[in-house]
Amino acid sequence: EEISEINHQGKVGVFVNETIERIAEISEKAKLNFIQLHGDEDEEFILSLSQRLSKEVKLIKVFRVGETFNFQFSIFNSLVDYFLFDTDSKAFGGTGKTFDWQILNEIEIPILYFLSGGISLENIHQLSTINHQPLALDINSKFETEPGIKNLEKIKIFKSLLK
C-alpha cells in the first residue's frame, strides 16, 4: 500500500517464479510501472500474465548469462518490452559479479535491454566496448554502503564517468 502512494513513473516489481495471480495483484495494488521477471517464466506464462496486466505496465524478462547461456530468446521478442542481461548464479538475485559483456557483441539483440551484474567504477570503461549499448544500467551492490543503502557519492562519480 505504501508503494502505491509513491508518485513515480519507474516503480519496478521484481518477481522470481511467482504466480500470475500474485504478480497481477501486486502490480495493481502497488501501481507498478514495470514487472521484472527473474525466474523460469516461459512464453506461455508471459503471454497469460500480459493479458492480466494493465497495458501501461511494461514487462522485463531477465536472462542469466553464464558460460553455457543459450541465446535463443527470440520467442520473447514480441511478448516483453525489454530484456535484462545479468550474471548467472546458482541462486536467483544479484551476485555482484560480471559476465563477459563481449558476448553481447556476438548476438543480435532485437529489443531494448538493460545490463546488470557487477557493474562498478572499476569496470565502467568496459561498457564502451559493447556495440549495441544498453538502454539502462542496473547498478546495485557495488554502489551500496550496506545492503539496500545506496552510496550517493559513488553513484555521482559513476554518472559523471558515463558522460
Question: Whereabouts are the PLM-identified features?
Answer:
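Intrinsic structural disorder
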Residues: 1-2, 80-83, 134-137, 163
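C-terminal helical cap(s) of enzyme catalytic domains, especially alpha/beta-barrels
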Residues: 1-6, 48-49, 140-163
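Glycine-rich phosphate-binding active-site loops on the catalytic face of alpha/beta enzymes
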Residues: 36-42, 88-94, 132-155
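Conserved anion-binding
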Residues: 4-115, 119-124
